[in-house]
Structure formats: structure tokens, C-alpha cells
């Protein structure tokens, strides 16, 4: 008998599951049935693409049996099965980053955490919530060896080669069938899970729409008038519906049907925000059923995110790991695509080049974006919930999906400096346009990483004073995405921290006086440009500033701060740093002092301090924090 230690994360996981989710124990059966369904799907797919499996003939089914007196529960599938290597990889160690994420995501809310178990792919271990010992007897398809994995949920497990007789005999399951049998030795307090009524209740609740039949084996007893058992018969009943819900007409389905199927599909017990059920007929025949989860998937912004859409061909499962079924920015969508026109033996390479699938993808994107628009028009409160979760991915689409950019521009939302909108309220481009000043030529925005800082930005001072609304874009990708979006309908989009965006601003004085002032400041501007030449392109007077003394402006053709950081991180930028422009407020006391001073040391110190504080407000690095502090101290000492 070979004994192995669990990987550290498995031990932590077992402890957390057993002690954190005790009031939602029934979910263990949901997880075991879902795993069985996955195993059946995998075998079905392998039989299509791998000649090794094509000769195997076995009814795809899930069987559940129990022994009430012995407090034993059996969950058996005729799926792909496992060998010793699979058992060690899948049940002894946890190689996926999702499990570590699960451990860090536990909320102490038992209902929410019981939902997370399945989404993070660690559902098997929930069996230890109800069992003092778990045995896994399994035979991989196309192999002859039977293996037995055993653990009491502590720190170790055993793994042995066993005889085929180790599989429990179940009516309807062909002898010698591949697949996996999970045997749970229930603890005393969980004896309810060795009763027919409780098992039927849980299966109906969570697994009614599993695509394979689930059979419950039980003993039907007959009693006499005194309550004595007079006859016992073995019975096998199919408990679940086992239909492809997406194939049924929408007129036959209720909202609760869609919600139950969503739970089965995603193991998410929270109802989805919306679902979209489409049947296409004509040159191409396919059905799609898409869901938008109420909460964003945990791996939404992981590079190795798991796709949420399953592909079927004529109801035969093909893959749930294909990222090309929908655009990357719609990776939060869950659901199924079932095509009548794709070949059953379709490979991943064929999928990526297939015209049928490309057409389904394009139509699905249009349908989903149309549903999002309908939601925005019909239920603003619900759309706000949607945007709170998925605004950022939709913005990614503005950058990557030119074909649907116009639709996406109507869907994305932003915060705003408008006093008519609460600070935590959303506004659309269309709503912004409806509030624009007469003859206003552009839509103005400011982008950065901190909403609070952006709201106090010096760049917005004159815009606010002169009645120009400014959109606040504080997602980390806004500074990368928005420069690629030049227009919304006929209005240009202008970042107020970019040179040229100030064209519509009125100068603080008459034109002649402004020109005269500019001329009067010319020597100072040239002087400051020379002092700061290693750090800035130019120092100029500002039309944007009314109260603040200085601000940093990006030249018209230079990348934003966010884009420059991305370029630097990916090695795409030149060694020489891109220099910004420093704007100063001619009306500010400090600038007046600069103009009047003949003290070169004072002018140099104050010039660098004005630059550094403008950089700090932008969230940019100052050249040297030590030099900055020394300069501030020297200026303070002057009084």
C-alpha cells in the first residue's frame, strides 16, 4: 500500500472546507455530479478525435447508490476515468493557480463560499464535509488497470492497484466499464445523505439539467399494517431531466428553468444578471444560450482566465477551453453554443479558422451587445450593476474590436465632474452630449488611476469655471484605450491634460492683454525652459489653470502616462524618457515672484519644485525625492 502526503495547499483546503462550510454540506453532491458529468464529456470528445477511444461502447450515465444501514454513498460515472498519474495530479496536488486564489477569496460567508468551491475547481474535496473516509475507484478508458485512492481527509492518502471487483456492482452499469466510482463513508451526523428523499431533493435542486441521465438505486420496501417489512425490491429511477435545455423552445421555459440551468452550468448559486437565448435557422443552424453572472468571475483579469462558454455540435460536447468562441473582452459571459453545421471531429486548429464558427461568433457579439443596450434603456439600475462589474472589459473592446466600436461607445460608462450627477454615478457619452454647451466642439475627459486625485486635478479648473463638463476616467486602461478612440459621433474626444485640448477655453483676459502678458513672460519662460531642459520640452503659460500654480501637459503626439508605463514594462520605449510640457499660471503669486526675482538659486529651486509638484499630482515620479526635499526646505528657510 503506497502512502503519499497531500500538498500543503490541499491540507489547508480540506481544513477550510470542512470547518467553514458545514451548514451547506449538501453542495458536495452537486460537485461530485458535476465532476462526473465533466468526465463523461471528456470521454465523449476523445471518442470523436482519438482512435484509441472510438471502439469503446458504453452508456454514458451517472449512478448513485446508498446503503442506509452502513451509511455509505456511491457516485459512479462511466466517463474518462483516471490512472495513477491522474489521481496524484488531480487529487493529491493542486497545480492550478485557481485553488490558491480560492483560499485567499474565502469570505466567511458560508453561502457565498459554498458557491466558490465549484467555480474554483476544488469541488471534490467537499466530500470530506460529510464523509469520514473517501475512496475513489477508477479505471481510465482504454486502459486495463483499476486504481483505488483512499483518504480520511487528514494529511495523507493511499494509492493502490486493485482488482476490477473493487467496483461496486450497479444495475445498468456494464461490467468492466471505464469511469470513476466515489465511495463516501458518511459520518454519523450526515446519515441523511444515505436516504432516498434527501438525495432526490439535492439532485433535483442542483443537477436536474445535467446532460447525462442520473440514476438513483434504492430499495423499495413494503410494510404490513404493523409496520413490519414484508417485501423488498431493488429499484433504479432516473432522477434528473437530462435534457439540453437550450434546445427547448423559449415558450416552454420559465425564468426559474434558466436560473437552474445556470447553476448547473457554472456552479454559481446567485441568479445571473441576464440571459440571452437565441435559435438561428436558415443557411446556418445553431442555438446559443448566454448568461452574464451577477459578479465578475474571479479570474476575469488573469492572463490564464478560463473561458465560460461550452461548444457543442449536435448536442455533443466538444470543448469548454476555447477562447475564440467570443472576443476576449466578453470573457465574463457564460453559456453554450450548439451548432448543427460543424463537423463532430472538429479540432482546435479547425475551430480557429472555421467560417461557420466565425459567423456564429460575429452574430453572438451583435446579439449580446444589443441585449446590453436594451438593458441600459429598460432598466437603468440593473445596468449600473452590470457596468460596475464589466465596464473595464467593455472598454478593452473599444481598443480591440473596431467592427463593434460604435455599439460599445454607447455601452461604456464614466464618472463625471458634472454637478448634476452624483460622484458615484455613471454617465454615458450620449448623456454627456445632451448636457453640452451650445456650439461646444469636443467631449472632454481626464484619465488616470485615482478617481479622487482626478477630481481635484488642476487641469480641470478653467473647464469647470467656464461650464465645460469633464469625464473622469480612472480605470487603469483608460489612458491606453481612449487615445485610440478619436470620436463619438461627430464630437472629438479630448484629454484635458494634452496640448491642444484647451482651444475652446477663453483666456483669463482680453486677447490683446493676453498677448501682451505672454510677451512680458517670454524671458521667464525661456529661462525656466533652460533650467528644466533635461526634464521638460517647454515651459509655457496656461489657459487651464485658475487656482493652481502649475501642471504637466502631454504633447499632442506623445503617449499618455499609462501608455508610456506599459511601453516601458514591455520594453517598447526608447531609453530616452519622453518629456512633458510644464504649464504655469501667470496669475499665481509664486509665478509673479519668479518673474520678479533676480536670485538665480531661488529661481532654480522654485522651478524644480513647481515641476515636481505637478509630477506628483499626476502620479509620476520626481527626479530625486532627496533633491525635492532639500529644495523645499531651502525655500521655506527663505520665509
UniProtKB/Swiss-Prot annotation:
Record SMART domains: HATPase_c
Stretches for region A: 1-348
Annotated InterPro entries: HATPase_C_sf (IPR036890), Heat_shock_protein_90_CS (IPR019805), HSP90_C (IPR037196), Hsp90_fam (IPR001404), Hsp90_N (IPR020575), Ribosomal_Su5_D2-typ_SF (IPR020568)
Classification via PROSITE patterns: HSP90 (PS00298)
SUPFAM superfamilies: ATPase domain of HSP90 chaperone/DNA topoisomerase II/histidine kinase (SSF55874), HSP90 C-terminal domain (SSF110942), Ribosomal protein S5 domain 2-like (SSF54211)
Region (B): 349-565
Entry keywords, A to Z: ATP-binding, Chaperone, Cytoplasm, Nucleotide-binding, Stress response
Gene Ontology CC annotations of this record: cytoplasm
Location within or outside the cell: Cytoplasm
Pfam family, one: HSP90
GO molecular function, one term: ATP-dependent protein folding chaperone
Region (C) location: 566-639
Family membership: Belongs to the heat shock protein 90 family.
Job of this protein: Molecular chaperone. Has ATPase activity.
PANTHER family in the record: HEAT SHOCK PROTEIN 90 FAMILY MEMBER
Subunit record text: Homodimer.
Name of this chain's protein: Chaperone protein HtpG
Organism: Treponema pallidum (strain Nichols)
Gene field: htpG
Amino acid at each position: 500500500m503506497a502512502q503519499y502526503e497531500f500538498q500543503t495547499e490541499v491540507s489547508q483546503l480540506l481544513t477550510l472546507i470542512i470547518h467553514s462550510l458545514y451548514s451547506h454540506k449538501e453542495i458536495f453532491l452537486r460537485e461530485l455530479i458535476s465532476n462526473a458529468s465533466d468526465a463523461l464529456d471528456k470521454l465523449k470528445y476523445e471518442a470523436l478525435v482519438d482512435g484509441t477511444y472510438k471502439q469503446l461502447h458504453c452508456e454514458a450515465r451517472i449512478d448513485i447508490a446508498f446503503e442506509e444501514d452502513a451509511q455509505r454513498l456511491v457516485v459512479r460515472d462511466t466517463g474518462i476515468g483516471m490512472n495513477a498519474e491522474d489521481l496524484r495530479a488531480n487529487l493529491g496536488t493542486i497545480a492550478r493557480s485557481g485553488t490558491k486564489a480560492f483560499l485567499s477569496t474565502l469570505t466567511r460567508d458560508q453561502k457565498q463560499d459554498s458557491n466558490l468551491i465549484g467555480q474554483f475547481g476544488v469541488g471534490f474535496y467537499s466530500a470530506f464535509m460529510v464523509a469520514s473516509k473517501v475512496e475513489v475507484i477508477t479505471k481510465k478508458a482504454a486502459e486495463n488497470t483499476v486504481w483505488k485512492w483512499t483518504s480520511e481527509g487528514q494529511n495523507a492518502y493511499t494509492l493502490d492497484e486493485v482488482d476490477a471487483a473493487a467496483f461496486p456492482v450497479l444495475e445498468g452499469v456494464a461490467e468492466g466499464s471505464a469511469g470513476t466510482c466515489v465511495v463516501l463513508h458518511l459520518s454519523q451526523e450526515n446519515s441523511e445523505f444515505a436516504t432516498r428523499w434527501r438525495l432526490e431533493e439535492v439532485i433535483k435542486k442542483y443537477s436536474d439539467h445535467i446532460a447525462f441521465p442520473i440514476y438513483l438505486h434504492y430499495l423499495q420496501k413494503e410494510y404490513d399494517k404493523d409496520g413490519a417489512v414484508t417485501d423488498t425490491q431493488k429499484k433504479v429511477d432516473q432522477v434528473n431531466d437530462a435534457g439540453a435545455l437550450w434546445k427547448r423552445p423559449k415558450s416552454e421555459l420559465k425564468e426559474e428553468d434558466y436560473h437552474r440551468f445556470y447553476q448547473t452550468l457554472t456552479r454559481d448559486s446567485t441568479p445571473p444578471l441576464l440571459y440571452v437565448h437565441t435559435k438561428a435557422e436558415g443557411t446556418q443552424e445553431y442555438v446559443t444560450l448566454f448568461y452574464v453572472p451577477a459578479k465578475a468571475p474571479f479570474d476575469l483579469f488573469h492572463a490564464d482566465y478560463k473561458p465560460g462558454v461550452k461548444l457543442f455540435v449536435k448536442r455533443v460536447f466538444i470543448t469548454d477551453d476555447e477562447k475564440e468562441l467570443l472576443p476576449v473582452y466578453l470573457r465574463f459571459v457564460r453559456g453554450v453554443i450548439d451548432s448543427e453545421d460543424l463537423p463532430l471531429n472538429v479540432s482546435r486548429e479547425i475551430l480557429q479558422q472555421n467560417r461557420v464558427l466565425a459567423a456564429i461568433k460575429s452574430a453572438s457579439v451583435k446579439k449580446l451587445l444589443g441585449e446590453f443596450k436594451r438593458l441600459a434603456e429598460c432598466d437603468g439600475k440593473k445596468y449600473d450593476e452590470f457596468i460596475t462589474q464589466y465596464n473595464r472589459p467593455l472598454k478593452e473592446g473599444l481598443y480591440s474590436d473596431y467592427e463593434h466600436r460604435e455599439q460599445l461607445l454607447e455601452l461604456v460608462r464614466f464618472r463625471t465632474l458634472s454637478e448634476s450627477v452624483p460622484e458615484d454615478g455613471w454617465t454615458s457619452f450620449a448623456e454627456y452630449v445632451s448636457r453640452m454647451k451650445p456650439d461646444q466642439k469636443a467631449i472632454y475627459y481626464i484619465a488616470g488611476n485615482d478617481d479622487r486625485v482626478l477630481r481635484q486635478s488642476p487641469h480641470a479648473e478653467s473647464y469647470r469655471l467656464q461650464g465645460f463638463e469633464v469625464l473622469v476616467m480612472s480605470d487603469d486602461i483608460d489612458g491606453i484605450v481612449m487615445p485610440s478612440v478619436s470620436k463619438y459621433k461627430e464630437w472629438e474626444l479630448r484629454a484635458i491634460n494634452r496640448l491642444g485640448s484647451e482651444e475652446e477655453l477663453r483666456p483669463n483676459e482680453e486677447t490683446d492683454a493676453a498677448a501682451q502678458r505672454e510677451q512680458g513672460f517670454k524671458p521667464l519662460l525661456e529661462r525656466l525652459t533652460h533650467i528644466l531642459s533635461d526634464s521638460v520640452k517647454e515651459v509655457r503659460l496656461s489657459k487651464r489653470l485658475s487656482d493652481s500654480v502649475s501642471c504637466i501637459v502631454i504633447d499632442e503626439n506623445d503617449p499618455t502616462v499609462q501608455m508610456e508605463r506599459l511601453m516601458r514594462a514591455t520594453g517598447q520605449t526608447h531609453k530616452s524618457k519622453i518629456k512633458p510640457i510644464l504649464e504655469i499660471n501667470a496669475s499665481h503669486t509664486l509665478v509673479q515672484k519668479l518673474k520678479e526675482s533676480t536670485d538665480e538659486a531661488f529661481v532654480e529651486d522654485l522651478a524644480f519644485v513647481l515641476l515636481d509638484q505637478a509630477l506628483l499630482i499626476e502620479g509620476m515620479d520626481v527626479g530625486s525625492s532627496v533633491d525635492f526635499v532639500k529644495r523645499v526646505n531651502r525655500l521655506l528657510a527663505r520665509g
